[in-house]
Every structure is written in C-alpha cells, then in structure tokens.
Amino acid sequence: MKIGLASYECRMNDIGFNLKQIEKAIVESKDADLVCFGEAFLQGFAAVTSDYEMDIKMAVEQDSLPVAKIRELSLQYRKAVMVWYIEKDGPDIYSSYALIEGGSVIHNYRRISKNWKDYNITNGNYREGTDTSPFLFHGVEMTVALCGDLWIYPESFRCSGLLIWPVYVNFDLDESESGEYAKQAAMACGKALLVNPLSKEPISRGGAFFFENGKVKQSLGLDKEGVLVVEV
C-alpha cells in the first residue's frame, strides 16, 4: 500500500479553502492509496477558542456538509483520506481524525490528551476519546495518535504495524528535532508516519516524515507544499 503524507497550507476558519486544498493534494498524490493530512487541517489550529458557544458552532458533525464533501472526494478519486477536524457530537466537542474511504467514515479517532484546548476554562462538553485500539486497513495494522497524545501517553499507542501521527508544529523540524520525534514514535511503533500542515497564522512550516526504528527514513522539506509517498 502507498500512503501520501500531504503537507499543504490550511487557513483558520476557512473550510472552503481547506477543502480545495484537500482535493488538490489528492490529485497530486498520484498513485497513493491513502492520503493523510496534518493536525488542524479542516478548520485550522487556532479555530478552537475555548468559548463553548463559539466552538460548538465551528465544530462539524460526521454527517455535516464539509465531511460529506471529503466523502465525495474519496469516491471521485478512489482514494482513502485521513483528515483532522473539530467534531461535534450532540452537545460535545472532540479533536478527531477520520479515515474516509469509498464515501464513508470507516474509522474515527478522538484525541485522548486534553491540551488541544484551554482545559482550565472549558466546560465538560469538551471531551477526549478513550479508544486507542489498532485497526486493520488494507491488511495493515494501524493506530493513530494526535500530536501531544504520543508525548503524554506513548504506551497507549503500541502497535506492530504502522503509526499515523498528524501534528501541528510551529517550530523547525530540523535534523535534530525530527530525530527526537523519530525516537518518540519508536516508543509506540517501529514504523511511523508524521505529517505537519503549512499555515501562515499561526505559523507552521509543514514537513512530512517516515520514521523506522527511531530513525528518519524519508522526509519532505519544510516551507513548501507537497506529498511524501511512502510504501508500507
């Protein structure tokens, strides 16, 4: 299976632009079977204000129009897509990462660490998930960790197959820094794919990496849009 790690620009609270970027990346991913995007992609990293009345309006449900558009794209281009979104489920809000294939959401991971919002002021409707179980996709055992999850609870993501690690990093992922991420990923899984979006506000320089046994095996440069295709 070939997996494309799409490091593309996303904009805060501009879902229309971000959906166009998703389609652009899918087209440019060529023969990838699955295209993965970084944390904060659909609504933008700073979209969460920790003001419940604002955030519940910003969040989207699995059957919302934006998610329906991504489902349509997965059908149109015959590719699976993994994308981060702020999810609304009834009165509750989650930081989630959906796997979409064939027009359906087939897996929906909810971040388990709490530092995606200002937890000192948010109410009980800002929720974390509890399920970190691996799942099978095209015969490959996979698990998903969202950004800080893997730094706080690495033992919860142990997997014999492949770790998908979408992040939002606002500092340089240079050789030294990416090496630290590779070592951290190895605490959970021998093979890991990290993808970081590009953003002007707040700043994120992008980049994508394939880690194996704590080492960087493949990478995509910073400050430019592109898709790193990895065969697993």
Regions found by a protein language model. Name each.
Residues 1-5:
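Extreme N-terminal starter segment of soluble prokaryotic enzymes
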